[in-house]
Curated annotation (Swiss-Prot):
Reaction(s) this enzyme catalyzes, per UniProt: tRNA(His) + L-histidine + ATP = L-histidyl-tRNA(His) + AMP + diphosphate + H(+)
Name of the molecule in the record: Histidine--tRNA ligase
Name of encoding gene: hisS
Cell compartment(s), UniProt: Cytoplasm
Biological source species: Crocosphaera subtropica (strain ATCC 51142 / BH68)
HAMAP family linked to this entry: His_tRNA_synth
Family the UniProt entry places it in: Belongs to the class-II aminoacyl-tRNA synthetase family.
GO cellular component: cytoplasm
Upper taxonomic lineage: Bacteria, Bacillati, Cyanobacteriota, Cyanophyceae, Oscillatoriophycideae
InterPro entries: aa-tRNA-synth_II (IPR006195), aa-tRNA-synth_II/BPL/LPL (IPR045864), Anticodon-bd (IPR004154), Anticodon-bd_dom_sf (IPR036621), His-tRNA-ligase (IPR015807), HisRS-like_core (IPR041715), HisRS/HisZ (IPR004516), HisRS_anticodon (IPR033656)
Length: 433
């Protein structure tokens, strides 16, 4: 009987990779916390109507990509395909607006879409996202862009391109939709199949087509920027000026429309050419009509989401990985020594040291080889003699220096030990540069 495998479009995140994920989450948490964004954790599945109303029934996400099922109460439920709709639902259901002012929220977790799996695109994928709800001020648009930039640059990504556009307000978009339909109709037979389907349903998405002939037709399509009203133009001009004031470089891309119906005014993407076809690492924009669409009062908002799988592909290319090696590796042999090793490991961990305890029970020679491979700075050795005398041998793995001490001395000198570990780390780092 064969082993059970993961489903297409899903994958295990294994221990050797998890350090990247924890690194990204830690950096994002630190930066967003400093900007007074609070984490929120909505459910992974919601009523299907939330996404039909929030994302738009005419979108590819709702029409083709959602994982939808009926539960035993015959309710239609959907695994969330994105995070914003659930956050807005939570904002309304839990009266987060009652405090007044703006709400700064962020989330992290898995999303689900039925797509063709490829590098950087999975059917279960993960996002870090934020939402700034309650203000139409262009400074909010720029604040969230600046925070995404800070996160990505702190992680070591420097060669990113920021594309921005304005998709205007509802009236602007309606006028633009009509202009697009009139432009594309004579070319209908030349458009790819998906774009033909989108022509009446969601013509803005034709601008995002990857088909070669459709892209050629798009080159002469009307620009959304030519259909913006005065208020939309003013908002977009202010966003550009504020980005310039912050020293954030950007490129205006009139074809940038994003894939969800709720976007208004500013839309943006952060792009890396290192990812091939799946180039967008972060995408977002303003969605001033979504709160009202989901039953609330008219409330402006802006947000983004970072795709973690794509981001981690980039981090691996940069070899930008956190240090996941132990400070100390404990080897022991014999029942009494192994028990004392466990106790020492726990006590040293409580003092803030990273400790790996060898539990193989194999000969010292094999344990020492594993200690060398672990990347640890020092090794604590416990044999039968050490167990009897309540002593240890502390061995520095790079210099091979070794010193004997009692277990009590080891624990009382943890501060000195940490200083010694730091010195050895600096020596090792210097020798590898």
């Amino acid at each position: 009987m064969g082993t059970i495998q993961t489903l297409p479009g899903t994958r295990d995140i294994l221990p050797e990779e998890i350090g990247y994920w924890q690194y990204v989450e830690t950096v994002a948490t630190q930066i967003l916390s400093r900007a007074m964004y609070y984490e929120i954790r909505p459910p992974i599945f919601e009523q299907t109507s939330l996404f039909e109303r929030g994302i738009g029934e005419a979108t590819d996400v709702v029409g083709k990509e959602m994982y939808t099922f009926s539960d035993r109460g015959d309710r239609s439920l959907t695994l969330r395909p994105e995070g914003t709709a659930g956050v807005v639902r939570a904002y309304l259901q839990n009266n987060l607006y009652a405090a007044g002012g703006v709400q700064r929220l962020w989330y992290c977790g898995p999303m689900f879409r039925y797509e063709r799996p490829q590098a950087g695109r999975q059917r279960q994928f993960h996002q870090i996202g934020l939402e700034l709800i309650g203000t139409a001020d262009p400074r909010a648009d720029v604040e969230v862009i600046a925070l995404a930039t800070d996160i990505l640059k702190t992680l070591g990504l420097q060669s990113l391109k920021l594309d921005i556009n304005s998709v205007g307000d509802r009236n602007d978009r309606q006028n633009y939709r009509e202009a697009l339909v009139n432009y594309f109709l004579p070319y209908k037979a030349e458009l790819d199949t998906d774009s033909q389907d989108r022509l009446q349903r969601n013509p803005l998405r034709i601008l995002d087509s990857k088909d070669k002939r459709t892209k050629e037709i798009n080159q002469n399509a009307p620009s959304i920027l030519e259909h913006l009203g005065d208020a939309s133009k003013k908002h977009f001009d202010q966003v550009q000026q504020l980005l310039t004031d912050l020293g954030i470089e950007y490129n205006i891309n009139p074809c940038l429309v994003r894939g969800l119906d709720y976007y208004t005014h500013t839309a943006f993407e952060m792009i890396s050419d290192d990812l091939g076809a799946q180039a967008t690492v972060c995408g977002g924009g303003r969605y001033d009509g979504l709160v009202e669409e989901l039953g609330g009062n008219p409330t402006p908002a802006v947000g983004w989401a970072i795709g973690m799988e794509r981001l981690i592909i980039l981090l691996k290319q940069l070899q930008s990985s956190p240090d996941m090696t132990p400070d100390i590796y404990i080897v022991s042999r014999g029942e009494a020594a192994e028990g004392q090793g466990l106790i020492l490991a726990q006590k040293l961990r409580k003092e803030g040291l990273t400790v790996e305890l060898d539990m193989s029970g194999s000969a010292f020679g094999k344990q020492f080889k594993r200690a060398d491979r672990s990347g640890a700075i020092a090794c604590i050795v416990l044999g039968e003699e050490e167990a009897t005398n309540k002593t240890v041998q502390l061995k520095w793995l790079q210099s091979k220096e070794q010193q004997a001490m009692t277990q009590a001395e080891l624990l009382t000198k943890v501060g000195e030990l940490i200083e010694q570990l730091d010195r050895h780390k600096r020596t090792m780092n210097h020798s590898t540069q």
